[in-house]
């Protein structure tokens, strides 16, 4: 993670300010040293990294690298928004107890395995790339200041 932070610090020139929210996305070669199956990681409040080679390696006949990339982008963005139970407690019981800050719903883009290369070997169609109803409700309640 230290190397990722160094790369961001050398490249990033836009930050949030006023009403502007800025997201910094790094596309990196190689892999995350703490989990070599990770396809992406959210590592700061407005930053996440995508491991392009790992995403391409996860693609196969039925699932394109573009579909995987889209799912991982939305998943990591969800973490930046606070999903699941990051700094709040959801009124819905949808956090996977074995994978904190991830959904227990395989149809949600916040499902824990979305960011893992192993997950895509088990699919026979497009991966989820949208938030489920509980994720959307949590985001709505956060927007309203109720969480």
Located regions from the model:
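Active-site-proximal segments of metallohydrolase catalytic domains
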Residues: 1-53
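Ser/Thr-centered flexible coil motifs
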Residues: 1-5, 132-137
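Residue-identity detector for glycine
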Residues: 17-18, 30, 40, 45, ...
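Short linear sequence elements within intrinsically disordered, low-complexity coil regions
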Residues: 32, 136-139
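The catalytic-center signature of Zn2+-dependent metalloproteases
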Residues: 56, 60-136
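Pan-zinc metallopeptidase signature
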Residues: 141-147
């Amino acid at each position: 993670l230290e190397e990722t932070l160094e790369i961001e610090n050398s490249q990033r020139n836009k930050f949030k300010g006023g009403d502007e929210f800025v997201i910094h996305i790094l596309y990196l070669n190689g892999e995350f040293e703490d989990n070599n199956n990770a396809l992406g990681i959210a590592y700061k409040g407005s930053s996440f990294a995508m491991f392009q080679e790992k995403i391409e390696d996860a693609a196969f006949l039925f699932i394109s690298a573009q579909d995987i990339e889209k799912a991982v982008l939305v998943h990591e963005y969800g973490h930046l928004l606070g999903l699941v139970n990051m700094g709040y407690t959801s009124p819905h019981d949808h956090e996977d107890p074995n994978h904190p800050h991830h959904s227990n719903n395989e149809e949600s883009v916040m499902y824990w395995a979305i960011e893992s290369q192993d997950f895509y070997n088990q699919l026979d169609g497009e991966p989820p790339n949208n938030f489920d109803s509980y994720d959307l409700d949590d985001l709505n309640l956060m927007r309203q200041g109720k969480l």
